[in-house]
């Protein structure tokens, strides 16, 4: 086994290179085989860990009883089942406040998230009895759940200036709750 090199899958080639060279007669073939086996087991375990899928709840776990899309309850329920992360949708209101809701116009109403005020939007009662949450209320809840990642979708707005303002306000809010390092913005 002198000069034996363990072949590493390409996905790990930048991280690991294992070579065994028999430099003296003090290392037996049995010892070399054990080292090779240990390295192979380590790499197999690393590959298994790296390949684990991560579950992200879309708009929270809103199909659970007493929940609704993008509600505070949907985030809490998603966190309770151990998801890796939870995705939310964020809009900038007409009075430049950030709210969490999926659709531009709330179903069954004429309330447009971008063209309505915070007061108008937060007066909407969701199917679970909550009101449409502000981003601030949502981030306060996320900050209290340190094991859950946030995937934040900034919704497209009517013009680039409003999108820039929304982005600035989102980053400021994430900083306020120290959540920048565990938030992905899409």
Regions found by a protein language model. Name each.
Residues 1-2, 7, 11-53:
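Bacterial Sec-dependent N-terminal signal peptides
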Residues 50-186:
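Phosphate-group recognition and catalysis centered on beta-loop-alpha active-site segments
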């Amino acid at each position: 086994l002198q000069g034996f090199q363990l072949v590493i899958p390409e996905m790990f080639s930048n991280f690991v290179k294992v070579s065994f060279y028999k430099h003296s007669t003090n290392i037996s073939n049995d010892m070399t085989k054990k080292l090779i086996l240990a390295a192979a087991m380590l790499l197999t375990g690393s590959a298994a860990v790296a390949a684990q899928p991560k579950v992200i709840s879309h708009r929270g776990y809103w199909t659970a009883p007493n929940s609704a899309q993008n509600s505070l309850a949907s985030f809490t329920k998603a966190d309770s089942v151990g998801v890796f992360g939870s995705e939310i949708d964020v809009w900038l209101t007409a009075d430049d406040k950030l709210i969490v809701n999926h659709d531009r116009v709330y179903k069954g109403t004429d309330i447009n998230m971008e063209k309505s005020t915070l007061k108008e939007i937060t007066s909407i009662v969701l199917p679970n009895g909550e009101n449409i949450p502000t981003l601030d209320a949502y981030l306060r809840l996320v900050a209290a759940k340190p094991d859950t990642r946030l995937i934040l979708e900034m919704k497209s707005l009517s013009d680039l200036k409003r999108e820039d303002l929304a982005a600035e306000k989102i980053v400021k809010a994430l900083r306020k709750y120290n959540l920048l390092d565990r938030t992905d913005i899409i």
